[in-house]
């Protein structure tokens, strides 16, 4: 239906005034192309990038990564930092747990000389530092480890045993309101690592919940549930862990997909193992008995040897990675303006099917 000409003129004048006052892009039509492109940073895991649909974690958004202890939360975020630094981006790590190991970070490919690090005394201080870094417009990725360690100032100054009901939740709620707009303007990715707690007296459904109240769940564009599903052994020695990540909320692509990969101790995500597995699954790598072949050339007998070949030949690894991304980041992952139910959590939509990569 055509809009009245006078109304069109009035609308154009209003839009012009808004853009003049608040900047270009402060208001736009939803169908415009520029609003649909989402810049992303790789997670360091090919299968997780594919499960996320957009090819990685979205810039200018809030992301929550949660899971049990020793499930790989910090390792995953350090891999994100390493990937961002390789693209020349500036990263900051807010270490509220005071537990960041620079030697381990360096092993995962993090340039520790150029990583900004803060160990704040209180939760308010940590969130103020986040806000200041965001408003500077010079920091591309900020990690907060973890929400559970963001202790309000009143709790630190009080006695052990004092009741501070809802204090952390109020602090997080206020911070989310303040940070969300600034992150979008600065195009900064903010990742919160969170821990799991059990709800008491839950007879039916999932008793697990995350700390810090509900605000983070609502403001996060992506929520990842990371779990350790098994151990990787060489003989009797445990050398890593099998890991599964579920995308329980996704505002930039289809949710409810999951990725499985290996985390090797001292090395991080086994990207070459993912390339072999996905290559075989999607017929880019041929497997005959124990032998693996790529483009007709044998690359190794057994998965370990095939992985070593890819590790020693980065050009072939990059070529295989590119082919898999082009093949698997397909039409179904494109943003749709009216994707109903796209941002709900897994808890709310129990029984949804998950696509695995």
UniProtKB/Swiss-Prot annotation:
Upper classification of the organism: Bacteria, Pseudomonadati, Pseudomonadota, Gammaproteobacteria, Enterobacterales
GO biological process, one term: DNA repair
Protein name: Protein RecA
InterPro entries for this protein: AAA+_ATPase, DNA_recomb/repair_RecA, DNA_recomb/repair_RecA_CS, P-loop_NTPase, RecA-like_C, RecA-like_N, RecA_ATP-bd, RecA_C_sf
SMART domains registered for this protein in UniProt: AAA
Region feature (Disordered): 334-357
Localization annotation: Cytoplasm
Native species: Pectobacterium atrosepticum (strain SCRI 1043 / ATCC BAA-672)
Role: Can catalyze the hydrolysis of ATP in the presence of single-stranded DNA, the ATP-dependent uptake of single-stranded DNA by duplex DNA, and the ATP-dependent hybridization of homologous single-stranded DNAs. It interacts with LexA causing its activation and leading to its autocatalytic cleavage.
DNA repair recorded as keyword: yes
């Amino acid at each position: 239906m055509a809009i009245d000409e006078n109304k069109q003129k009035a609308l154009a004048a209003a839009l012009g005034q808004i853009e003049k006052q608040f900047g270009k892009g402060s208001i736009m039509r939803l169908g415009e192309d520029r609003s649909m492109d989402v810049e992303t940073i790789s997670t360091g895991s090919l299968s997780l990038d594919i499960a996320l649909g957009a090819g990685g974690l979205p810039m200018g958004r809030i992301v929550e990564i949660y899971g049990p202890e020793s499930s790989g939360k910090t390792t995953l975020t350090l891999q994100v930092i390493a990937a961002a630094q390789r693209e020349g981006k500036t990263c900051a790590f807010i270490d509220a747990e005071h537990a960041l190991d620079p030697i381990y970070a360096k092993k995962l490919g993090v340039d520790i000389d150029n990583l900004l690090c803060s160990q704040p005394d209180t939760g308010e201080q940590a969130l103020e530092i986040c806000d200041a870094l965001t408003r500077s417009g010079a920091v591309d990725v900020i990690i907060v480890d973890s929400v559970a360690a963001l202790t309000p100032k009143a709790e630190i100054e009080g006695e052990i045993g004092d009741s501070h009901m809802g204090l952390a939740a109020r602090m997080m709620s206020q911070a989310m309101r303040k940070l969300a707009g600034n992150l979008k303007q600065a195009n900064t990715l903010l990742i919160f690592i969170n821990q799991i707690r059990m709800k008491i007296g839950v007879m039916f459904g999932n008793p697990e919940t995350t700390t810090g109240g509900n605000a983070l769940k609502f403001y996060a564009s992506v929520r990842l549930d990371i779990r350790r599903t098994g151990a990787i052994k060489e003989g009797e020695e445990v050398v890593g862990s099998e890991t599964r990540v579920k995308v329980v909320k996704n505002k930039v692509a289809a949710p409810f997909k999951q990725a499985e990969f290996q985390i090797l101790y001292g090395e991080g995500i086994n990207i070459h193992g993912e390339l072999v597995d996905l290559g075989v699954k999607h017929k880019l790598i041929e497997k005959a008995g124990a032998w693996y072949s790529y483009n007709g050339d044998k690359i190794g007998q057994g998965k370990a040897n095939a992985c070593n070949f890819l590790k020693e030949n980065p050009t072939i690894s990059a070529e295989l990675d590119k082919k898999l991304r082009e093949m698997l980041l397909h039409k179904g992952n494109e943003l749709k303006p009216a994707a109903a139910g796209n941002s709900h959590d897994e808890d709310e939509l129990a029984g949804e099917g998950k696509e695995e990569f």
